[in-house]
Design a protein with these regions (language model features):
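NAD-dependent ADP-ribosyltransferases
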Residues: 1-167
Length: 167
């Protein structure tokens, strides 16, 4: 990952798996983990330790973003269903679903803050209708996701072939 000074860009993104993406698109909102799962930050800390995450409880009250060209969001998605060594050798890495937002727009959100680690994070929720620039969905998930997309967001959703990617 390049130094922050070299990484300032136009977009930030939030990545997630296909199941969560269906719920996000259906609701039209990106939700913090505490809002999405109806659990406390403390409960989520205990659950997520199994996947190697050591985040403090208050992190789960925010929607986190990475810079638009960084892979960190895909690493988070991978940590929840890590591919085996054979999958990596064959290039069977499937990227997560990405929700891109213009940085200049999201810094105007009343719930935004900076933690020194993420480029930005937002407390509780973000309306896709107000902030989404583009949703990039791996082509292989199209049938699973397309029925969950609200009419108002269809023009912002794009499917890209992503089979055979490797880290």
């Amino acid at each position: 990952i390049p130094p922050i000074a070299d990484a300032i860009e136009e977009f930030v993104y939030h990545a997630t798996n296909v199941d969560a993406a269906q719920k996000i698109l259906s609701s039209g909102k990106l939700l913090s983990a505490t809002k999405a799962y109806g659990k406390t930050g403390e409960e989520l800390v205990i659950e997520r330790k199994a996947n190697g995450w050591e985040d403090p409880a208050h992190f789960y009250e925010y929607v986190m973003f990475g810079w638009g060209t960084h892979l960190v969001g895909d690493y988070v998605v991978l940590s929840e269903d890590f591919p085996c060594e054979e999958d990596f050798a064959k290039g069977n890495f499937d990227a997560g679903v990405r929700f891109y937002i213009r940085y200049k727009d999201i810094i105007k959100h009343k719930g935004h803050t900076f933690d020194g680690y993420h480029p930005i994070k937002v407390k509780d929720e973000i309306s896709l209708f107000d902030y989404l620039f583009a949703c990039i969905i791996p082509e292989q998930y199209k049938e699973q996701i397309e029925k969950h997309i609200p009419q108002e967001l269809i023009a912002k959703v794009h499917y890209l072939p992503q089979r055979g990617l490797s880290l």
